[in-house]
């Protein structure tokens, strides 16, 4: 067998392995949050980026073996940004045989009129886009709206709110839309961005650049993203542990009087969630919570997360 054939077999093996992991992650998120139910019509929001392409591909894959029947309709919003390649998504979706709708709205013109040159346009653009997508979901009879945010997006939002907003608030895997009419789901909630990047490269999705509008990136989010990438590289398992923490919240050991009745504690109260452990040295597991080392991660024991002294 030639060297090229050996490489091809190895690449295919790695792709299959990666797809299985993404499929498992998406399947677990769907089950944990009851994202998809019998007869659902899922509107898959397709931007032309790696995340939404991956979401559509994995949902199509799961559709073949899911215990419930559901349909997919891909929707792209053409915001009339200069240089937007209008042919790419229709051609791609036609070849897949996926039902789709391209919505044309000149939100770019509205944003450029309202926002001064050089300022970030993302906030206004996002609000306009959200309203259009809600309207489109109603027109298409969609029961769920699927967005392509992944685990790293959720963690970034948590830290953004803590560092700059003074609140512990992330990005929910499932929620009721702003207009109170639509259920929004994030099937990639358990997926790592680096897995999505590798999958996207291997599948050679026709990526459409996200900065055609010329808007400046959100600098705060970029700082948080760089911080998380640095932690993931230097302390394997830290990202997984932090995401596990978001699923293991103990309100009685925080300080939000709206989540726990601190005023109601008296001499007749029971011990709640282990009482006061502030002065006890907890037993810290060697392996960070939620982390499973993988063959291709090349993670070293000496780089494991030191939970006692977080750097």
UniProtKB/Swiss-Prot annotation:
Belongs to the TtcA family. Pathway: tRNA modification. PANTHER family: AMINOTRAN_5 DOMAIN-CONTAINING PROTEIN, SULFURTRANSFERASE-RELATED. GO terms for cellular component: cytoplasm. One of its GO terms (biological process) is tRNA thio-modification. Binds 1 [4Fe-4S] cluster per subunit. The cluster is chelated by three Cys residues, the fourth Fe has a free coordination site that may bind a sulfur atom transferred from the persulfide of IscS. It comes from the Bacteria. [4Fe-4S] cluster binds at residues 122, 125, 213. This is tRNA-cytidine(32) 2-sulfurtransferase. Its cofactor is Mg(2+); [4Fe-4S] cluster. Its EC number is 2.8.1.-. The gene is ttcA. GO terms for molecular function: 4 iron, 4 sulfur cluster binding; ATP binding; magnesium ion binding; sulfurtransferase activity; tRNA binding. It is an enzyme of class 2 (transferase). A motif (PP-loop motif) lies at residues 47-52. It catalyses: cytidine(32) in tRNA + S-sulfanyl-L-cysteinyl-[cysteine desulfurase] + AH2 + ATP = 2-thiocytidine(32) in tRNA + L-cysteinyl-[cysteine desulfurase] + A + AMP + diphosphate + H(+). The thiolation reaction likely consists of two steps: a first activation step by ATP to form an adenylated intermediate of the target base of tRNA, and a second nucleophilic substitution step of the sulfur (S) atom supplied by the hydrosulfide attached to the Fe-S cluster. Transmembrane segments: none annotated. Keywords: 4Fe-4S, ATP-binding, Cytoplasm, Iron, Iron-sulfur, Magnesium, Metal-binding, Nucleotide-binding, RNA-binding, Transferase, tRNA processing, tRNA-binding. Pfam families: ATP_bind_3 (PF01171). It is found in: Cytoplasm. Homodimer.
């Amino acid at each position: 067998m030639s060297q090229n054939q050996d490489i091809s077999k190895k690449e295919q093996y790695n792709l299959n392995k990666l797809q299985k992991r993404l499929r498992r992650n998406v399947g677990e998120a769907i089950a944990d949050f009851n994202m998809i139910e019998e007869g659902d019509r899922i509107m898959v929001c397709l931007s032309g980026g790696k995340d939404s392409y991956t979401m559509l591909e994995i949902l199509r894959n799961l559709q073949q073996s899911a215990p419930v029947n559901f349909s997919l309709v891909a929707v792209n919003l053409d915001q009339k940004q200069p240089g937007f390649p209008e042919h790419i998504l229709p051609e791609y979706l036609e070849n897949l045989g996926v039902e789709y709708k391209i919505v044309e709205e000149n939100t770019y013109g509205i944003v450029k009129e309202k926002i001064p040159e050089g300022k970030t346009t993302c906030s206004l653009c996002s609000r306009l886009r959200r309203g259009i997508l809600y309207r489109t979901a109603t027109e298409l009879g969609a029961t769920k709206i699927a967005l392509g945010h992944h685990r790293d997006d959720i963690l970034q939002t948590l830290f953004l709110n803590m560092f700059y907003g003074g609140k512990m608030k992330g990005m929910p895997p499932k929620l009721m839309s702003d207009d109170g009419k639509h259920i929004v789901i994030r099937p990639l909630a358990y997926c790592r961005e680096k897995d999505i990047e590798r999958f996207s490269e291997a599948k050679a999705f026709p990526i459409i650049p996200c900065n055609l509008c010329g808007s400046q990136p959100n600098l705060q989010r970029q700082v948080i993203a760089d911080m998380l990438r640095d932690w993931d590289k230097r302390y394997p398992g830290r990202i997984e542990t932090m995401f596990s923490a978001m699923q293991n919240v103990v309100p009685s050991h925080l300080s939000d009087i709206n989540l726990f009745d601190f005023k109601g504690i008296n001499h007749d109260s029971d011990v709640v969630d282990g009482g006061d452990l502030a002065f006890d040295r907890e037993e810290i597991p060697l392996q960070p919570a939620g982390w499973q080392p993988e063959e291709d991660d090349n993670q070293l024991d000496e780089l494991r997360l030191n939970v006692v002294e977080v750097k």
